């Protein structure tokens, strides 16, 4: 019983202690929660103060920005207003000045009109007086000579007319001389201006190219076994290849600049590559021809761009680049055309013409020379037909005809091209007549050979002493080759004059190609 009581008391005491401990713990937690709540409240309050401060700063900045923009707009508006006000004031002042000037002009006109009326009155009086005097003279003449008044009047008028005609002729002759002298002086001034403002480079074209090689052993490889390589080179390239005792040099000779340039490039590539054989020669030749076509087009585009021209047909642009490989009387056709274009532009500008149109006509005036190796006819007709086909400006076509006297120049630009062409071609040292005669002769040789049916190509070599004719093996047999050679030789003998003899060499080669699959 006592133990139970003790246990009960212990339990009650334990419960009391537990309650007190729990209360203490709860009180401590409550205080912690309160402190945490206070801390959070302070943090929220601080954050709110920061937000409020930021908001105030933003509002202040916005107010300042608005104020700044307002001031800027106000300043700009005030500035514009002042500017417009000044403009209006100036216009008003100008109008007042013009009004005053008009008043002065009106007064001057009134005075002039009055003066004219007075002069007219004086003239009428003089006229009447003259008529009276004339009547008196006529009466005296009629009385003394027995002539009627009308007959006497005719004699006097005829005499006056003769005197007047002499005076007029003298005046006309005087002013005509002055006009001629002034025109000559002006023309000399314009030419001096043009030539002083443009100084073109000039280099005479040659008939040979020299290829430098590292050692003379390469000469043997270029010649090949029994001359096989050099014969293939000459046949494919259409040039003379001269391999002599000159150390470290091979000479390529041909009157055609284009063929000579291609031949030079092909041989240089073969020497660099080291594989010199007929198949490789043809492969390199085909590759170089494609490269030259691209280079010619690029050259034409560069020139057109440098001259500031536009809307030129691509085919004409390509032919402009091709002029680089044409020469006339030893003068490079492209260099000559560029010189004419620049000079014509300057002359046209000085005379009040269209400078760009004159440059266009100048660069195209000899465009037909790019076609003379491929088509029959003069370069004037070929160039004019080409420009008509691609709808070039009529002034350009007129300049092409006019610079060789086929037509009269119908514009300032055409006349400028004619003058520039003469300046470029006629200056000392610009052209060589002997070279041109030689080039014409070898061109005629090739044309005669190409005119025959069944001929693929023809090359004049050995300074025109030999014509190498490539026959189409499908159209010409061996017997016909002999006849072709005789026909070509007979036509050359009939149509051309030349010293010595010309060898006609007809080459027929048949290639059969098949592929193993």
UniProtKB/Swiss-Prot annotation:
SUPFAM superfamilies: Eukaryotic type KH-domain (KH-domain type I), HD-domain/PDEase-like. It is found in: Cell membrane. Residues 333-426 form the HD domain. InterPro entries: HD/PDEase_dom, HD_domain, HDIG_dom, KH_dom_type_1_sf, Ribonuclease_Y, RNase_Y_N. GO terms for molecular function: RNA binding; RNA endonuclease activity. One of its GO terms (biological process) is mRNA catabolic process. Keywords: Cell membrane, Endonuclease, Hydrolase, Membrane, Nuclease, RNA-binding, Transmembrane, Transmembrane helix. It comes from the Bacteria. Residues 207-273 form the KH domain. The chain crosses the membrane at residues 1-21. It is a single-pass membrane protein. Its EC number is 3.1.-.-. One of its GO terms (cellular component) is plasma membrane. Gene3D superfamilies: Hypothetical protein af1432, K Homology domain, type 1. Its main location: membrane. Endoribonuclease that initiates mRNA decay. Belongs to the RNase Y family. PANTHER family: RIBONUCLEASE Y. NCBIfam families: HDIG (TIGR00277), RNase_Y (TIGR03319). This is Ribonuclease Y. It comes from Campylobacter jejuni subsp. jejuni serotype O:2 (strain ATCC 700819 / NCTC 11168).
